[in-house]
């Protein structure tokens, strides 16, 4: 049996683990004879609009939970897929597990898959160029305004070294503070060698993804040096577990605080900045390198959230990604894709024929 999360951002890790464990024990005791139905949908959707608190994915998950409550389904899972993967198995999917009722599993899986497919256009996102996003943020009364640089999402496989937002942020010559995270081991080494309070001249960022980003020359003051150890405190991702991103440093260029680290780190928890003396609630602009996972902890803080359009290997602009291995045709990469979920899966048809 497969049991998936019901929240994105994933704040139900513990609950899902308990649910899976209980189901496993019931299977082992003979109380449940799992019957499972699977539907693969020829579709990729951007992660930026897959939150379950609202929107199309939230509505689909409401249906899944209703099935679990009212139709005796053991587990109903909807998988929105990691859109940046270039694999032959690519595509959104639905899995339904029932207690021996194969027909119900098949019907629910097909119904959810068709509903998922029909809502595909609702997952489209409006991305804002970085320069315009910064101007919009500065026009807002108060803050913080959170800029999501999802194309460089450290939780999506990107290196975290993009200067796509950093460069225009520095060029804007802000009068109010801003914070951004950047992976740059060379900059950290320079900062640690210079010491706190020193002024350093260097090029920062663009160390790894040189196709999509270029280093930015800066004159920065070393505000803080640390060992890069910090503990996420918010519900969801590695709560209470100390993580280490190598040595770290906070560089100050005008009003911009650049938290640099030798290794990557998830940016979904404000504690990343707080552990380095930066309070996100006091910033005018906070840049997170995450498509959606940040919402659980940043939405209560944010005056506004803007999805920024910058080049990168985890871009929401799916047409810009160099897919080579995904099955074709697939939405939205190809025009005229059609889909209707089968009433019964091929595997179950073969199983029924073998029993006949």
Kindly label every feature range from the protein language model.
Residues 1-33, 144, 149-166, 170, ...:
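Active-site histidine-anchored catalytic micro-motif
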Residues 7, 22-33, 62-73, 99, ...:
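Generic secondary-structure signature for well-ordered alpha-helical cores
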Residues 32-36, 45-132, 139:
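Accessory alpha-helical/coil subdomains and C-terminal extensions
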Residues 49-56, 136-138, 154-166, 191-196:
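Short glycine/threonine-rich loop-to-helix capping motif typified by GTGT followed
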Residues 94, 114-117, 229-356:
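Extended hydrophobic packing segments that form well-structured cores
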Residues 99-102, 151-154, 184-187, 256, ...:
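Short, glycine-/Ser/Thr-/acidic-enriched flexible segments
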Residues 139, 144-145, 152-155, 238-239, ...:
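Non-transmembrane, aqueous-exposed alpha-helical and coiled segments at domain scale
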Residues 185-231, 306-313:
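Acidic, Ser/Thr-rich peripheral helices and adjacent loops at domain boundaries
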């Amino acid at each position: 049996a497969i049991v998936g999360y019901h929240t994105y951002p994933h704040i139900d890790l513990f609950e899902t683990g308990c649910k899976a464990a209980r189901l496993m024990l019931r299977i082992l005791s003979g109380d449940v004879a799992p019957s499972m139905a699977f539907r693969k949908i020829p579709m990729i959707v951007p992660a930026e609009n897959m939150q379950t608190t609202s929107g199309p994915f939230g509505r689909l998950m409401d249906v899944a939970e209703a099935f679990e409550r009212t139709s005796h389904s053991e587990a109903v899972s909807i998988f929105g897929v990691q859109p940046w993967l270039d694999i032959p198995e690519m595509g959104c999917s639905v899995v339904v597990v029932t207690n021996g009722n194969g027909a119900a599993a098949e019907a629910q899986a097909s119904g959810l898959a068709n509903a998922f497919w029909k809502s595909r256009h609702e997952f489209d996102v409006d991305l804002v160029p970085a320069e315009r996003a910064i101007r919009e943020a500065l026009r807002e009364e108060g803050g913080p305004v959170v800029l999501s640089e999802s194309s460089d999402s450290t939780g999506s496989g990107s290196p975290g070294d993009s200067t796509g937002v950093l460069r225009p942020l520095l060029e804007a010559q802000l009068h109010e503070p801003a914070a951004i995270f950047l992976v740059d081991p060379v900059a950290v080494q320079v900062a640690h060698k210079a010491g706190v309070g020193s002024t350093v001249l260097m090029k920062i960022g663009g160390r790894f993804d040189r196709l999509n980003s270029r280093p930015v020359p800066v004159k920065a003051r070393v505000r803080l040096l640390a060992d890069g150890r910090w503990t996420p405190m918010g519900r969801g991702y590695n709560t209470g577990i100390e993580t280490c991103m190598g040595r770290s440093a906070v560089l100050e260029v005008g009003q911009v605080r650049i938290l640099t680290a030798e290794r990557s780190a998830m940016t979904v928890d404000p504690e990343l900045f707080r552990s380095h003396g930066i309070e996100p609630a006091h910033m005018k602009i906070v840049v997170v390198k995450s498509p959606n996972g940040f919402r659980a902890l940043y939405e209560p803080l944010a005056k506004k959230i803007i999805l920024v359009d910058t080049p990168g290997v985890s871009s929401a602009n799916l047409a810009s990604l160099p897919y080579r291995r995904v099955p074709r045709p697939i939405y939205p990469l190809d025009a005229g894709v059609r889909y209707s979920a089968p009433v019964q899966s091929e595997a179950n048809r073969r199983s029924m024929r073998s029993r006949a």
